[in-house]
Amino acid sequence: MVSRRAFLAGSAGLAALPTLATLAACGESGTTFERMRASGVARIGIAGERPYGYLNGDGAVTGEAPTVARAVLADLGVGGIEAVQVPFARLLTGLLDGQYDLVAAGTTITPSRCARVAFSRPDFLAPLAFLVPEGNPQGLRTLGGASRSRTRLGVLEGSAEQDYALAAGVSPTAITTYDGQSTLYRAVANGEVPAAVLTRLSLLDEQSRNPGSRLQVTPGFAPSTTPTGEPVYPVGAFAFRPADTDLVVAFDTALTDLQTSGRWLETVRPFGFDDENLPPAGLTTAQLCTS
């Protein structure tokens, strides 16, 4: 996540990085990157969360993160991807257990996750929002407000939103966890919980597929890490095993090229992203892992 001050400050530009050709030639024998380049296929972990990473009606993997990953990996000489879908809460565990080579699911960078895995450079910014009944009867605008009103909230199990809610003072007993985006949506629709919190992009995508639900998505907001703290912007990225340093460096270089060339926006627009979701050029993963 990134503070509002850091977000507005941005940066003068991206640091110089090695060329893709140089990086591709440096893979050590036996590394994940070497195996991917030899086979031409990367295995990616997804959680079925729209619009980040999911399977379409034909069973093909799609979403913002797999599509960006496909473009980045193609620039690295890896032309194919195979998806493994697991529950959201098991994404990082599956990565560390070797089920796939990287996570392409719009995973939010947080210090606790940085202690387990290596993240790519920031891929996108994603403000949060509430899913509430029409008219927003609780008047929810922020997680601090939800805490003060003692509103019960639905969240995805193991999500950054769960951590944000707890940090904002929401009682653990007021939080109900769900294992999937659609299940979370139905919980509000069925009155199991009066509200849910998730990225606004996810909620708008779910809302578009549930016309007539009599629910609404609130305006986006930046959560705080404490009840009175400075707002922070959730930032999504790709996750890797810590030992796969050559893959992370190569992936970052290609992702940087994709973002600075304008191809990133062309790639993500079909999934509801726009230039407001593009991270500031100078925002680094190191900053996010310590904030």
Residue ranges and their predicted role:
Residues 83-93, 176-186, 190:
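Short helix-initiation/N-cap motifs at beta->coil->alpha
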Residues 125-131, 211-252, 275-291:
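Periplasmic-binding protein-like
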Residues 41-48, 52, 143-161:
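Short loop->beta-strand "edge-of-pocket" segments that line small-molecule binding or catalytic clefts
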Residues 33-35, 121, 133-152:
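Flexible hinge/capping segments at coil-to-helix
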Residues 32-106, 115:
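Extracytoplasmic small-molecule ligand-binding "clamshell" domains
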Residues 1-18:
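N-terminal secretory signal peptides and thylakoid transit peptides that target proteins
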Residues 27, 63-75, 136, 144, ...:
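Extended ligand-binding regions for polar small-molecule ligands
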Residues 106-115, 166-167, 194-232:
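A ligand-binding cleft/hinge motif common to bilobed small-molecule-binding domains
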